[in-house]
Amino acid sequence: MTDIGAPVTVQVAVDPPYPVVIGTGLLDELEDLLADRHKVAVVHQPGLAETAEEIRKRLAGKGVDAHRIEIPDAEAGKDLPVVGFIWEVLGRIGIGRKDALVSLGGGAATDVAGFAAATWLRGVSIVHLPTTLLGMVDAAVGGKTGINTDAGKNLVGAFHQPLAVLVDLATLQTLPRDEMICGMAEVVKAGFIADPVILDLIEADPQAALDPAGDVLPELIRRAITVKAEVVAADEKESELREILNYGHTLGHAIERRERYRWRHGAAVSVGLVFAAELARLAGRLDDATAQRHRTILSSLGLPVSYDPDALPQLLEIMAGDKKTRAGVLRFVVLDGLAKPGRMVGPDPGLLVTAYAGVCAP
């Protein structure tokens, strides 16, 4: 198990490479990373104002001209007006190309602050400090940034790798339980596409997997981050292999949009994982036991595994505009076995209907 008293570093081997440091009390690391910057802007969500101010003061103590930029929580903060606000503040305080941003918050804060960093002066440095499980294992690692528009989720964005990612496990101590549960969907995804030990650890004790004070969760986080780091290193710009990280996301993103983002990302992805497993099972590509294992593990963590039985026509319409769709043809990441991800391109409409009915069955 990962020793939460000793920081662990996972390297993301892109060019240039950067570290993902997992531990507790990592603000000293942040000071060291940014001590040579003239100005720094800390982009944070409302509930983290106190931590953001501590960061500002610590950087100021190192001679850095640091500022705070507060943005709305969750998906409400991932739109063009919020990015425009960040740009306006960056211009007002004079952030230059050799300065830096810090993102502090969940996955949405990482996405929008990362996009602002990618586009301001055509790219300035950013350090991510994710404070949610979802942000730690998914949004903060890999360099994907983006915002939502009326056309869809994350359709506007850029690849912009951070200077570093600091995963401070202490922030999980105060994370609401429903946030912890939803973040586990991305951990489970990593288990199915690449690291079955993740699934074994969860099955052994689902409640221990959700305990921020225990030693199981840090190990799950390390393993999930390692999966993503290895995939990103092999395919930074999502030309092919990185697409496997979208397992469960085609339907998941459609559910989020249909629900106007009232459903949490992890909850929607959980249903998407079950749907993708059912697609593969019906197509003869995945055995019954592994497909059922999706439901069992996700349910044991308190994640949803079914959705509105009447929603498929609307979901299909939304999925047709998904960024993973090419030339109007739906694409799904599916499994050809445990830790054997593949793709299903243009599935038969009848197969989609039958698979969705299976998801909606009690």
Swiss-Prot record:
| Biological processes annotated in GO | amino acid biosynthetic process; aromatic amino acid family biosynthetic process; chorismate biosynthetic process
Q: Which UniProt keywords apply?
A: Amino-acid biosynthesis, Aromatic amino acid biosynthesis, Cobalt, Cytoplasm, Lyase, Metal-binding, NAD, Nucleotide-binding, Zinc
- What would be an example GO MF term here? nucleotide binding
GO CC: one term?
peptidoglycan-based cell wall
Pathway membership, UniProt: Metabolic intermediate biosynthesis; chorismate biosynthesis; chorismate from D-erythrose 4-phosphate and phosphoenolpyruvate: step 2/7
Q: In which broad location class does this protein mainly occur, judging by the first location in its UniProt entry?
A: cytoplasm
Name any cofactors this protein relies on: NAD(+); Co(2+); Zn(2+)
Q: Which family does it belong to?
A: Belongs to the sugar phosphate cyclases superfamily. Dehydroquinate synthase family.
**Its biological purpose:** Catalyzes the conversion of 3-deoxy-D-arabino-heptulosonate 7-phosphate (DAHP) to dehydroquinate (DHQ).
- UniProt-recorded name of the protein: 3-dehydroquinate synthase
* Gene from which this protein is expressed: aroB
